[in-house]
Amino acid sequence: AELVEDIKNQGKEIGVEVEGVKVNFPQVIAHKNAISKQLTSGVAGLLKLNKVKKVDGEAAFVGEKRIRVTKPDGSAEEMTADAIIVATGSVNAVPPIPGIRENPNCIDSTGALSLEKLPESMVVIGGGVIGLELACAYAAFGTRITVVEAMDHMLPMLDGDLTKIGVAHM
């Protein structure tokens, strides 16, 4: 998306005029998927190289330095460590908006990164970092974007000065 934006906006400054820049959106998604697969396998290789043990399952604390992991097959394993880091990633928040769960056109950020067709228009609910990243990327591809934010300014979780800088670069 950034490359398309650069070609459209900055090319003229350096004497490059390009007519009819076209985005092949299915190819963009295929490229994104290939990179994602490469990164995932790279992480697996790093874990193996560094002799990191990976255990699939759900953890529960059973002591100050002890957890019990229930594996997908139902078996359990207890582990002890001097430090336990909870780094489980994030889950998309689904706000209490009437009809949101029943609407097939309502997608989360993961779904937005997996669309097969570039939409002509898009409403992004939430003016936080992820919402604005998606809004800017899709706008660069040519989608008409509207961002809905409940707070009185975009990027409400950031410091006011950072918010001004971020919004100025949109």
Model-assigned labels for residue ranges:
Residues 1-118, 146, 151-155, 160-169:
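Glycine-rich flavin
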Residues 122:
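Conserved class I S-adenosyl-L-methionine
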Residues 125-128:
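Glycine-rich Rossmann-fold phosphate-binding loop(s) that bind the pyrophosphate
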Residues 131-132:
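N-terminal Rossmann-fold NAD(P) dinucleotide-binding loop
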Residues 135-140, 146:
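Gly/Ala-rich phosphate-binding loop of Rossmann-like dinucleotide-binding domains
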